[in-house]
Every structure is written in C-alpha cells, then in structure tokens.
Amino acid sequence: MSKVTGIVTELITPIVEEVGLELVDIEYKKEGSNWFLRVFIDNETGNIDIDDCRLVSEKLSEKLDEVDPIPTAYFLEVSSPGAERPLRKDKDFTKAVGRNVHITTKEPIEGATTFEGELVSYEDGKLTVKEAKKTYVISQEQIDTARMAIIF
C-alpha cells in the first residue's frame, strides 16, 4: 500500500461505513499525464448503484478537499468493485468459497504463479483452489493478487 492510499484509507473508511457501505479497495495511480484516485465500495448484497457512488463521492470529495492529503491534482472515481472484485480480507475469501477466483503468487507453487479455478475452501489463511486438472493449497502470505474470476 502506498503512502497516499494508506492515508486516504484512514480518512475515508469511516465515511463509507457511516453510510452503511464497505470500502473494498483504493487505487492511486498515474495513467498518462493524469493521476486517479479510485475508490471501490460494496454492500452486503453486492448491489451498489449510481446513487451509492454519488453519495460516497460527494462526501469523500468534501473530506479530501478539507484535509488535502494528496499533493497533486487527481480525478476521484467511486464505483463498485465489479464482477472481478479484488479479494483482500478474510471475509472476502470466505464469501468467495464455491466461486471462481484468479490468484497470482509471489513465488511459484509447483512451477506456477497463476491459478484460476473454484475456491473450494478458505480456512486459517489457506485457500484450496481447484483447477480443471489439479487442486492447489495456497497460503494467504504467498498471494500477490487475488480476485473473483469469470471463467468461460
């Protein structure tokens, strides 16, 4: 997590929770000559709508303008995490059991660093991912990125 995303996370988590939503992820990155602060929100049902995004965007914009934690000009975007939402917290992995996931690891496991298949179980920081021909057990510490996956 970058310094900016760490500071922004602390500032905006209470705002998102105050309106009954969950902060899923924050992304701060440069694309071309522009900086973007992307805030991904969700709720228990996974049904975020444009009104939720607008409400959070207005509240965040006000707070960010007041505190001004970002040294450069940027575009603020608030959205749902989408169908391929990132998996970061224990509850994200628990909710994803029985669904398809895409995992990349920091180091190879049995020669591979990318795994895509059904998350069969998640327990004590260990994921069991079943691909078409093989099942892997991956510890959370080994994960570089994890997200939901749509497999055709």
From Swiss-Prot:
NCBIfam families: PRK00092.1-2
Cross-referenced Gene3D superfamilies: Ribosome maturation factor RimP, C-terminal domain (2.30.30.180), RimP-like superfamily, N-terminal (3.30.300.70)
InterPro entries recorded: Ribosome_maturation_RimP (IPR003728), RimP_C (IPR028998), RimP_C_sf (IPR036847), RimP_N (IPR028989), RimP_N_sf (IPR035956)
The UniProt record lists the keyword Cytoplasm: yes
Keyword Zinc: no
Subcellular location, record wording: Cytoplasm
HAMAP family recorded: RimP
Location (main, coarse): cytoplasm
Any one of the GO BP annotations: ribosomal small subunit assembly
UniProtKB keywords: Cytoplasm, Ribosome biogenesis
Functional note: Required for maturation of 30S ribosomal subunits.
Organism whose genome encodes this protein: Brevibacillus brevis (strain 47 / JCM 6285 / NBRC 100599)
Protein name: Ribosome maturation factor RimP
One GO cellular component, as annotated: cytosol
Family in the record: Belongs to the RimP family.
